[in-house]
Amino acid sequence: MNEFDRVRDYLTDLQDRICAAVEAIDGKARFAEDLWQRAEGGGGRTRILRDGAVFEQAGIGFSDVSGARLPPSASAHRPELAGATWRACGVSLVFHPHNPHIPTTHANVRYFRAERDGEMVAAWFGGGFDLTPFYPVDEDVMHWHRTAQALCAPFGEERYAAHKRWCDEYFFLRHRDETRGVGGLFFDDLGQDFERDFAYQRAVGDGFLDAYLPIVERRKDTPYGEAERAFQLYRRGRYVEFNLVYDRGTLFGLQSGGRAESILMSLPPQVRWEYGFQPQPGSAEARLADYLIPRDWLG
């Protein structure tokens, strides 16, 4: 089996396993599957769970797509690849819980291959996961980062620190001067050693559930009211702003003629903006600002 097919098989299995785990913890709703084809090449399967007991919406998509020419978003940092043919596969997910005390989360693992005249000119892995709480709890954030550190440990002492820093820098809303959440891991252009890099991608993909599900279990029965729900919807606006303004995956998908429904499944089903909103000083809502600054979460 060639390298691309090995990655592809892992990713389809990862999607299956995450869906099964989410359905189990939700206990009510199930994923609906949408199989799709892309005219320019390839296709995928998008799965959406809606109106569950825990999740308002959970979307997880697998895609294996190809094209005759790299779009600008993919070659901006690699100008030598401009005009190359390409093929990419990946799994991307975003989960929006009902309860404002459960953080929203995002994860992505992907593999990209570029060719010219039938010869591979570049191939690399990318991905990571990040956490966006509305009412953060130190215990949860520390668990998230300690899980990330543990899965990084076999790949060198600097791996966690480097990819945590990259995550803090990437998921930053410059126009708001704040991070999107409390970070996690982010990496791209990892293509020096296929076996080692593929092992790391698997560690990140497999580690996501270990990082997220214990937080869901701890917070899913926390009581909340209209004020917490309103704040959750307001903060979801930041999620929308980042995805539509900065996210390279979203831009790549749209610029490459990707399937808009699947690309935009990350957006929350409900969201609100409020002009000039400021939380009351000392309130639980005001505490969030202290978490939207990069810091050491290992304790």
From Swiss-Prot:
Protein name per its UniProtKB record = Oxygen-dependent coproporphyrinogen-III oxidase
Organism classification: Bacteria, Pseudomonadati, Pseudomonadota, Gammaproteobacteria, Lysobacterales
**EC numbers, comma separated:** 1.3.3.3
Q: Where is the signal peptide?
A: none
Record-annotated disulphide pairs:
none
Q: How does it assemble?
A: Homodimer.
Species, as recorded: Xanthomonas campestris pv. campestris (strain B100)
Q: Which UniProt keywords apply?
A: Cytoplasm, Heme biosynthesis, Metal-binding, Oxidoreductase, Porphyrin biosynthesis
Q: Where does a divalent metal cation bind?
A: 96, 106, 145, 175
